[in-house]
């Protein structure tokens, strides 16, 4: 039976038992920051186990079934080496939130396994918690499992969470019952006589039934008290791939139909045949590529922290095993389409996101293989210096790992092939000495010898400001002068470390004049750091905020500084900002002055002084002037001059910017006929000619504050994308309304007029409905207490507005306290007389809700809410009146 068929049989079976089938939730938990990935079938349903109402599709469902994709990396070192561990798996589950309990869960599990999957009842074993007589008796008396195939175990094996009674945590917990399948003596060891015995694979756990019935309370650690929960829940999990291996009669899940095609493709790529349990690398690659594709398809990205590092680690581990098979070029991305083909029918996001996933994997592979190549060269040099039979020192093996990300197992493998050993104990000692923070990231802070501010002052005194090369180049060779972390100076920084890098010269533009700081890469032999942004001190020393991704960055290192090519888009937007400023002055008048700006690769934002919103024709005129300027392809030039001279020439200064004695003036020629010319003091980056901007489109115009307006615009390809998107939306709207685009506005006006007329009709009908309901009584007879007339009316089918109108009408008819109910909604209205006697609507409604259920509030004469029991409300209201 194919895996997809098993999955469908399970979900259909429990649908037949009154369960709602839900699609798999994302691997990326939406509202649970405690989880990196969804790691169990019940994880996305946690709120409903804790008491939240399980509302799906507008109704309450107490029974749910899912096939949930999960990702766990706690036992990653065992993946590929055993038949029980994998990272990405699918968990079949049926859940009850305060509905059925042990009897149904056990009977249905047995029914599904024996009648629908046709498993031999004689090969099924079960275990229960040692004190759970109820579950034991259900298995023995109702199901008919012989006592010799029912095992009783303690809290470590058959209680959830494991060991909770003695060790905690406090909270919902309960016994569990596990179902095992006996694969026969061929899969076991002599000491394996039943579930949880021996070390073989004979007895395979296929289903765990958790009976959440207690609230564990007490000291941690220490013996806890188990108090019965008011709501008893069922949480079950069946391992889809384990069941598939049994039904497909293969030795383990690696040979099932969703795994084995990947293993076969790895064997074909590498020329190394798969030989079962000994082919660890084939297994690791198949497992890890599935996990990486699934995580990326759900929105994860590679990074050095959190879930991004988990999938990076999985990819690199798979690449290392590929290297052991002789796969020295990127190959994992070529397996991604196969993963999507095998799983995409049930997880369509894998097919939908495949192009992006392939690209991400390819780029990540290329980066890591570059690192491996550098490590291989270093290892070759080290081994060449050893005598036959000697051992590579552990500190050298660790340096390979530290600097090049070169894995120890690969070092051992290559050294062994050439007749050398590796001091693995020395490797571990070196790692401990470096005080590795975790497997997720490592940071090195050697010889913290000076405060960062002191270092910057000394650098400026010795070398002056950073030399900026970015006006003419996006790449440059530079020397690392300092590394700063917080207020401390470092001599070196390893993978995962975030530092401020000071270079002797740089092509990176430092944030200023509205233009964002450049981002990109610093590269050196065996290493790379990603620059996230660039700023500079008042003395002109550039600080590159960077995170080391590969290798170790050291003071004195020669690096290649590479600005991200999107800087060209920033240049387009910066020059366009100057053109926009001049065009606004030409259209609106000389009162327009810059009041702020943002220049980024994907957009520009320009704040300017102007007292009122721009008229549509003014915006159109501004946009047209800028685009004519662009099409004319005028030159953009700049030169340095004394500040006073620049001001005399009419160069405009930027808002909030500080200038020195000598300034840079950027000039853009314009058409004398249009009265256009731009001349501004600016240290930013610009295009050489206006034609390079391509196009200019205004996206929005709005107020920032009194007398200050803001325009957001796009240029170049972003402008084309924006225009195309707008046209596509217009076309789609026209098609939806079944008119030509030219007639769209007329059609919309007609529809809006019709809508207003219908709304008037609806309001009229609601008013008549209220009057009819009140005229019919609606249970709204007036009663009196303490001089106040009160009434409770039930009027089905009204919305909140109509309810308020009904309450107003009742007060107008003489009621001092009117409570109107419709469905789950309620409105309470007081007359001036009732208020004069000290009643307040909000307080009265809350008091009523305490006695009749529900919730709500208000103030003065009006309160509203929902959930009141009509009978209880009618009985309770007079008792709350004075």
UniProtKB/Swiss-Prot annotation:
UniProt cross-references to InterPro entries, sorted A to Z: aa-tRNA-synth_II/BPL/LPL, Ala-tRNA-lgiase_IIc, Ala-tRNA-ligase_IIc_anticod-bd, Ala-tRNA-synth_IIc_core, Ala-tRNA-synth_IIc_N, Ala-tRNA_ligase, Ala_tRNA_ligase_euk/bac, DHHA1_dom
Domain notes per entry: Consists of three domains; the N-terminal catalytic domain, the editing domain and the C-terminal C-Ala domain. The editing domain removes incorrectly charged amino acids, while the C-Ala domain, along with tRNA(Ala), serves as a bridge to cooperatively bring together the editing and aminoacylation centers thus stimulating deacylation of misacylated tRNAs.
Compartments reported by the entry: Cytoplasm
Record carries keyword Secreted: no
Species the sequence originates in: Thermus thermophilus (strain ATCC 27634 / DSM 579 / HB8)
Compositional bias annotation for Gly residues: 854-868
TM region positions: none
GO cellular component: cytosol
Taxonomy, superkingdom: Bacteria
Primary localization class, coarse: cytoplasm
Protein family according to the UniProt entry: Belongs to the class-II aminoacyl-tRNA synthetase family.
UniProt name for this protein: Alanine--tRNA ligase
Reactions catalysed according to its record: tRNA(Ala) + L-alanine + ATP = L-alanyl-tRNA(Ala) + AMP + diphosphate
An example Gene Ontology molecular-function term: aminoacyl-tRNA deacylase activity
Cystine connections: none
Entry's EC annotation: 6.1.1.7
Known role: Catalyzes the attachment of alanine to tRNA(Ala) in a two-step reaction: alanine is first activated by ATP to form Ala-AMP and then transferred to the acceptor end of tRNA(Ala). Also edits incorrectly charged Ser-tRNA(Ala) and Gly-tRNA(Ala) via its editing domain.
Pfam families xrefs: DHHA1, tRNA-synt_2c, tRNA_SAD
Note describing how the cofactor binds: Binds 1 zinc ion per subunit.
Binding site for Zn(2+): 574, 578, 682, 686
Known cofactor(s): Zn(2+)
